[in-house]
Amino acid sequence: MISQSGTILGALISRGAARGIGFSKLVSVGNESDLSVGEVLDLMIDDDGTDAILLFLEGIRNAESIAEAAVRAHKKKKPILAYKLGKSEAGRELAVSHSGALASPGRTTDAYFKRHGIIGVDMLETLFEMPPMVMGRKPEPGNRVCVVTTTGGGAAMVADRLGQQGLELVGPTDRLRERLRRLDVTIGAGPLVDLTMA
């Protein structure tokens, strides 16, 4: 874990521990007056005890060094996940006043993360939930996703998020529908596999 906030590390440790996630290294770079996020990130890539790298960012000071490290991390199949403050105007102002770092608009940061293979997350909790899901896995080609759910409301939230990410929501194949029918599971004709009443 690399953080631009020292105080937040305590909260991050307890949240990670609650999910059974340990940390090989915890580094706070503060306002990066000495070490930068990119420099520490580069060191973590070669650390055998580190399987995934989590970033807590208030702003991005040296985008080039982070980008270069991200390329190396990708080659070593070590995912980088980042939670960045300052997605709103108020959040950007606070981040700048606290660390003095460049707090770019959310869309700019999202594009930067996507370009360099960094997985950006919108919620702090997601920072801890994602590593087990992405470690050692290659991104699947294509942009089609089938959603299996036990709640219509939750599925609608997922569908919303998929649409925002430019992913296509597709229904189950005829083969899957037939397999479910043989198990006495009937699903609707829509693009979701809703098992609420199954």
Each model region followed by its residue ranges:
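Catalytic-core regions of core metabolic enzymes
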Residues: 2-198
